């Protein structure tokens, strides 16, 4: 057994964190755009189907996201001038290049999300994992023109060496830890790496598939989360970061998408809100709160 050694315990009241132009809260929206294998089980609306090969029912349900759902989400984010930070399986670049092109036209950010959602980073030695991380970085850079700065592990899974390898490969932030409302530095062997606030609560997979919430309840959860963070962020030095994690095969469905539209309308009609991308938050932190490289 071991204790974690990646970060220090720093209580919120002991920190100082501000945002550009005195914003109370930074809001970033993360569409997860993923590629699945037809012969491997994954996220399912009908779990018994995962025993079938091919699992046409669940594969088709997920495939709705890249065929229809993502385009509906793009329209909604466009309407509110909200940039997306896409958590991107690298294989999307080969299978659905039109999504990459549309995101680039909008100025969206693309962060690494592994090569495919069929391969979480578990039970890998360092060389194997480095190869996967590097392949993800290189494929996304080739498709978008920029190396990805952020990382979200498939299924938010890591090995004990993942943060070290991410820093080695030039990544600036990682979203797997989900344990804070503010960014903070991680200890890595060389360089620097931030833990960026992500959410497994304001996230449509657990909300709909685990908790069984309706779309209107998800909207209310987004609004409630925002309201509390917005009020807390009014205190000088106590600004917050709010993540909204989306999957196009869930929130991209018509009966759910209108509630996302309403939630984003509510957020963007507030003053002192910075609606931005993960890379912009990471850049602001690095410039405003420089840390010594980890040893």
Predicted regions, residues:
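Short, glycine/charged-rich beta-strand-loop motifs at protein surfaces that mediate ligand recognition
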Residues: 209-212, 249-253
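Catalytic alpha-helical scaffold of carbohydrate-active enzymes acting on polysaccharides/glycoconjugates
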Residues: 2-194, 219-244, 250-295
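A conserved mid-domain beta-alpha-beta active-site/ligand-binding segment of alpha/beta enzyme cores
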Residues: 197-231
């Amino acid at each position: 057994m071991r204790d974690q050694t990646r970060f220090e315990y720093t209580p919120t009241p002991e920190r100082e964190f501000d945002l550009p132009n005195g914003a109370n809260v930074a809001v970033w929206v993360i569409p997860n755009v993923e590629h699945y294998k037809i012969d491997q089980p994954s996220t399912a609306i009908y779990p018994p189907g995962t025993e079938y090969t091919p699992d046409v029912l669940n594969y088709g349900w997920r495939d709705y996201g890249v065929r229809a759902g993502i385009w509906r989400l793009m329209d909604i984010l466009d309407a509110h001038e909200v940039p997306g930070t896409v958590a991107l399986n690298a294989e999307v670049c080969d299978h659905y290049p039109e999504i990459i092109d549309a995101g680039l036209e909008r100025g969206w950010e693309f962060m690494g999300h592994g090569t495919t959602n069929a391969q979480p980073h578990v039970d890998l030695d360092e060389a194997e994992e480095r190869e996967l991380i590097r392949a993800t970085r290189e494929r996304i850079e080739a498709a978008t023109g920029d190396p990805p700065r952020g990382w979200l592990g498939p299924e938010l899974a890591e090995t004990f060496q993942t943060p070290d390898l991410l820093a080695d490969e030039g990544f600036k932030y990682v979203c797997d830890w989900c344990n804070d409302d503010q960014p903070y530095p991680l200890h890595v062997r060389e360089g620097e790496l931030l833990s960026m606030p992500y959410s497994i609560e304001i996230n449509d997979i657990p909300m709909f598939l685990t908790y069984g919430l309706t779309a209107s309840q998800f909207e209310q959860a987004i609004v409630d989360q925002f309201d509390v963070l917005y009020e807390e962020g009014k205190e000088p030095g106590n600004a917050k970061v709010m993540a909204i994690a989306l999957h196009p095969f869930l929130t991209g469905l018509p009966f759910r998408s209108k509630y996302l539209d309403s939630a984003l309308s509510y957020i963007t009609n507030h003053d002192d809100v910075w609606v931005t991308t993960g890379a912009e938050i990471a850049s602001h932190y690095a410039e405003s709160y420089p840390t010594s490289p980890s040893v």
